[in-house]
């Protein structure tokens, strides 16, 4: 039976995956296992794509024969490393290359990237990179990677003669269908990243689950957090924009960062104020929510002392802030006008916590 006939069930399965929303790690692992089962001699495979996330520029699934596939993420600053600069993946991205094959042994041996020498030392004999460009996909916003978007898969074999022509044909035939299935999953992941980054986890999930109309929402008991930066108007008027933003982010890292570290959720940055909640379901969880909120407050105060000592040592302006906490039921949902909404909390508990915070100015 031909390779094309052997891999047809895999292609059909990938079409089904594209119509679903599978776990991308499991999908890649299963595809690799099915390819090896029909005789394609892969022993190492990597799936790489760029994402849209405040921390990560790219994600990759790592599969090695006999092991479970795992997901790894690359920070934005990782693209400046020497390893990346000398990577075949960077070459493929920057030169819009769709197929790159390197034989690692024999008369056609080509080791023009450092990783190829490493793979040869590990016993690999053949290396293949397949890239599928996806229009209307995401971009990192990095001008150095403009247009560098799509799905990249690398395959490596340790069979003595490497990949046969039939193997190469099979992998290239599967690539486009697999890229389509990946696009479905990746766009869903990116939507979740964007929703949770700008709305928070709870609000993001609610919106993605269909609560998109004005008035959609829920009632929930919560410990509500409201913090506000002192003298922000004076700082904004007297400081250079870059200096002011640096202070503002240091303050947000101190307050919102502590809130998140203790299980809270940031709902909104209102100018230089932070609005967040520690939700709980019933009275049995109230004490835990209060303890988490108080622990977050303690951490924020400790962090502010550390940051202000460092800022004073470097001649920078120190910052101060107030925090108010309140417990009660809040209305959590969509407010605004039909075509422009904000997912936030409203109610007397929120109004009270803002007034409580303002009282810290008198202390």
Go through each PLM region and give its residues.
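Short amphipathic alpha-helical segments
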Residues: 8-16, 21-36, 112-116, 168, ...
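Helix-loop-beta substructure at the N-terminus of cytosolic sensory domains
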Residues: 20-70, 262
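Regulatory sensory and allosteric helical modules in signal-transduction proteins
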Residues: 67-129
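Regulatory loop-to-helix N-cap segments in sensory/regulatory domains
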Residues: 134-172
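Regulatory cytosolic signal-relay segments
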Residues: 165-219
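Catalytic NTP-binding/metal-coordinating core of nucleotidyl cyclase/transferase enzymes
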Residues: 213-295, 343
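Alpha-helical scaffold within the catalytic cores of cyclic-nucleotide enzymes
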Residues: 249-263, 284-323, 327, 348-359
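Catalytic strand-loop-helix junctions within cyclic-nucleotide turnover domains
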Residues: 277-288, 323-343, 359-362
């Amino acid at each position: 039976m031909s390779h094309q006939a052997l891999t047809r069930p895999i292609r059909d399965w990938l079409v089904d995956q594209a119509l679903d929303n599978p776990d991308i790690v499991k999908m890649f692992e299963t595809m690799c296992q099915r390819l090896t089962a029909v005789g394609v001699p892969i022993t190492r495979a990597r799936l790489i794509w760029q994402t849209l996330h405040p921390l990560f520029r790219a994600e990759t699934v790592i599969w090695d024969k006999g092991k479970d596939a795992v997901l790894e993420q690359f920070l934005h600053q990782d693209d400046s490393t020497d390893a990346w600069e000398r990577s075949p993946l960077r070459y493929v991205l920057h030169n819009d290359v769709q197929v790159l094959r390197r034989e690692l042994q024999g008369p056609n041996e080509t080791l023009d990237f450092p990783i190829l020498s490493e793979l040869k030392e590990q016993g690999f004999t053949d290396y293949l990179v397949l890239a599928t460009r996806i229009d209307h996909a995401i971009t990192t916003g990095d001008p150095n990677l403009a247009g560098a978007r799509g799905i990249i898969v690398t395959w490596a074999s340790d069979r003595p003669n490497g990949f046969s022509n039939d193997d190469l044909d099979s992998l290239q035939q599967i690539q486009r269908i697999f890229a389509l299935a990946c696009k479905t999953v990746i766009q869903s992941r990116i939507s979740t990243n964007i929703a949770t980054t700008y709305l928070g986890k709870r609000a993001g999930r609610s919106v993605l689950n269909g609560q998109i109309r004005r008035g959609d929402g829920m009632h929930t008991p919560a410990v509500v957090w409201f913090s506000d930066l002192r003298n922000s108007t004076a700082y904004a008027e007297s400081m250079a924009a870059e200096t002011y933003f640096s202070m503002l982010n240091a303050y947000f890292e101190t307050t919102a960062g502590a809130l998140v570290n203790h299980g809270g959720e940031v709902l909104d940055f209102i100018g230089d104020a932070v609005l967040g909640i520690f939700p709980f379901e019933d009275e049995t969880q109230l004490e835990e929510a209060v303890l988490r909120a108080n622990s977050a407050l303690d951490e924020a105060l400790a962090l502010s002392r550390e940051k202000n000592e460092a800022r004073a040592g470097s001649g920078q302006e120190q910052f101060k802030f107030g925090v108010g906490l309140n417990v009660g039921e809040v209305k959590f949902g969509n407010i605004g006008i039909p075509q422009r909404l904000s997912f936030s909390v409203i109610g007397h508990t929120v109004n009270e916590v803002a007034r409580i915070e303002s009282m810290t100015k008198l202390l």
